[in-house]
A protein has these predicted regions:
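Conserved short "hinge" loops at termini or chain/domain junctions
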Residues: 1-98, 102, 140, 144-163
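Short conserved catalytic/interaction loops centered on acidic-Pro-aromatic/His motifs
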Residues: 126-136
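Structural motif
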Residues: 101-111
Length: 163
C-alpha cells in the first residue's frame, strides 16, 4: 500500500501478505518435486508458526538492506525502514509525483521481502542451489531498487519537487 503524507511516501506491506507470497512460491517448488518423484512434499515446504521468528529475522535483514540502498542513493529515508505492527514500513521524506516510480518501489519492497523469506527458508532446509538462486534474485531486486530510487531522485531534482 502506498500513502502520501506531509511530503512523504509511505510504503507498507503486511507481513502476512509477504509470507503468503513466499508460501505460494514454496508450493510451486513443492509441486515440481511431486512431478519428479511422485511424493507429496507440501508439508515440507510450508511456513509454520514455528518459522515466524526466522521470518522476522529475515525481514529485519531485508529492512536493513533496503534502508542502506535508499540512504546511499537518495540520502533521504526519514523514519527508516522498519517492522511496525506486523507491517514492513518504508518512509521516504521527499519525493516526486511520478507514480510509476513509486509503484515500482512498492513492488520491489514486496519482492525483496518475499525473496528474503525464501532465501532464509532455503538455507534452513539445506537447499544450497535454491539459496543461491534466491540470493541472485535478491541481488537483482536490490539493483532494481537502486536504479528506481535514483530515477525517482533525478526526476524530483529536475522537476524541483524536493523543495
Amino acid at each position: 500500500m502506498i500513502t502520501y503524507n506531509d511530503n512523504k511516501i509511505i510504503i507498507t506491506h503486511s507481513i502476512a501478505d509477504v509470507m503468503s507470497s513466499a508460501q505460494y512460491q514454496m508450493s510451486l517448488f513443492a509441486r515440481t518435486l511431486v512431478d519428479k518423484d511422485g511424493l507429496d512434499h507440501a508439508e515440507d515446504y510450508t511456513i509454520k508458526e514455528s518459522d515466524k521468528p526466522a521470518v522476522l529475522i529475515a525481514l529485519q535483514e531485508v529492512c536493513t538492506d533496503i534502508r542502506e540502498v535508499l540512504l546511499i542513493l537518495t540520502a533521504d529515508v526519514s523514519e527508516a525502514v522498519k517492522i511496525d505492527n506486523d507491517n514492513i514500513v518504508v518512509t521516504i521524506n521527499k519525493y516526486n509525483n511520478n507514480t510509476n516510480y513509486v509503484k515500482q518501489l512498492d513492488d520491489i519492497v514486496g519482492n525483496l521481502s518475499s525473496i528474503g523469506i525464501l532465501q532464509s527458508w532455503a538455507k534452513k532446509t539445506n537447499l544450497p542451489d535454491k539459496a543461491e538462486r534466491f540470493a541472485s534474485l535478491y541481488s537483482a531486486n536490490m539493483t532494481l531498487l537502486g536504479s528506481v530510487a535514483l530515477r525517482l531522485a533525478e526526476v524530483s531534482t529536475s522537476d524541483n519537487l524536493f523543495n
